[in-house]
């Protein structure tokens, strides 16, 4: 129904990863303890990949904040309510399936500058700042991130192991991303009002205006502690489950 964040239903077999997969569209989420790959393509939207390694369960969401002109620090705004709702749906489903909030680790992606003409700042920047701030205030540690920039991204997440691989795409290669996200911004008022009404009822909003951001350094930053960077389609050498692979399309 339109007031709920729907579970992704596009199931397939992924020949590249040699396992069952799920493709997530905007405003969808999926959680599993199975040996699967969750795949999505992001423009200015963001995806949070959250895992409980002890329970062997994880999930992903894919969402965009409605562009109501509000700053990400305004917790009572409609867009912040919807963002909090999108995150809480994922977190609550993981808890229902046996995950423990105190063990959750997050990897966050997207927020690219692929949409123009928004009312305030670039919508990708707003989405990125929101997901960082939300997770910091929820005390869920971000162990890897690849946010902002000018590229769409293809993200593949293996919830059982926590492994993530990211491919940065040229916008012309994924022309449908911008069109799809423009359509999201033009959603009719009734559908948006229903989602926001559900968010107001079901989500307790964060309100701390100055919490410190828990974030890791970006992959391109030369620092010893950053996550290792590997190619999306690289050979199967062992990696730590906290690492994310990434590459840019030439």
Swiss-Prot record:
Pfam families: CheD (PF03975)
Annotated EC: 3.5.1.44
Reaction catalysed by this enzyme: L-glutaminyl-[protein] + H2O = L-glutamyl-[protein] + NH4(+)
InterPro entries per record: CheD-like_sf (IPR038592), Chemorcpt_Glu_NH3ase_CheD (IPR005659), Cytotoxic_necrot_fac-like_cat (IPR011324)
Keywords, alphabetical: Chemotaxis, Hydrolase
Stored SUPFAM superfamilies: CNF1/YfiH-like putative cysteine hydrolases (SSF64438)
This protein's record includes keyword Hydrolase: yes
One term of GO molecular function: protein-glutamine glutaminase activity
GO biological process assignments: chemotaxis
HAMAP family: CheD (MF_01440)
Classification via NCBIfam families: PRK13487.1 (NF010013), PRK13489.1 (NF010014)
Family as reported in the entry's similarity comment: Belongs to the CheD family.
Annotated function: Probably deamidates glutamine residues to glutamate on methyl-accepting chemotaxis receptors (MCPs), playing an important role in chemotaxis.
Protein name per Swiss-Prot or TrEMBL: Probable chemoreceptor glutamine deamidase CheD
Gene designation: cheD
């Amino acid at each position: 129904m339109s007031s709920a964040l729907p579970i992704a239903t596009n199931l397939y077999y992924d020949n590249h990863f040699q396992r069952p997969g799920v493709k997530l569209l905007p405003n969808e989420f999926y959680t599993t303890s199975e040996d699967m790959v969750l795949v999505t393509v992001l423009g200015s939207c963001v995806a949070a990949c959250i895992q409980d390694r002890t329970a062997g369960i994880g999930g992903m969401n894919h969402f965009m904040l409605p562009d109501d002109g509000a700053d990400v620090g305004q917790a009572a705004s409609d867009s912040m309510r919807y963002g909090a709702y999108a995150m809480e749906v994922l977190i609550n489903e993981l808890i229902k399936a046996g995950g423990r909030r105190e063990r959750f680790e997050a990897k966050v992606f997207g927020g690219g500058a692929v949409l123009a003409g928004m009312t305030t700042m670039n919508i990708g920047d707003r989405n990125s700042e929101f997901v960082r701030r939300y997770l910091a205030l929820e005390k869920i540690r971000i162990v890897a991130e690849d946010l902002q920039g000018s590229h769409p991204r293809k993200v593949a997440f293996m919830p059982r192991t926590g492994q993530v691989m990211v491919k940065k795409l040229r916008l012309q290669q994924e022309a449908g991303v911008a069109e799809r996200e423009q359509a999201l911004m033009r959603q009719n008022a009734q559908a948006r009002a229903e989602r926001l009404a559900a968010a107001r009822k079901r989500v307790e909003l964060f309100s701390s205006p100055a919490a410190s951001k828990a974030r890791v350094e970006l992959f391109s930053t030369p620092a010893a502690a950053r996550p290792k960077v590997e190619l999306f389609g690289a050979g199967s050498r062992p990696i730590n489950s906290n690492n994310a692979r990434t590459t840019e399309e030439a």
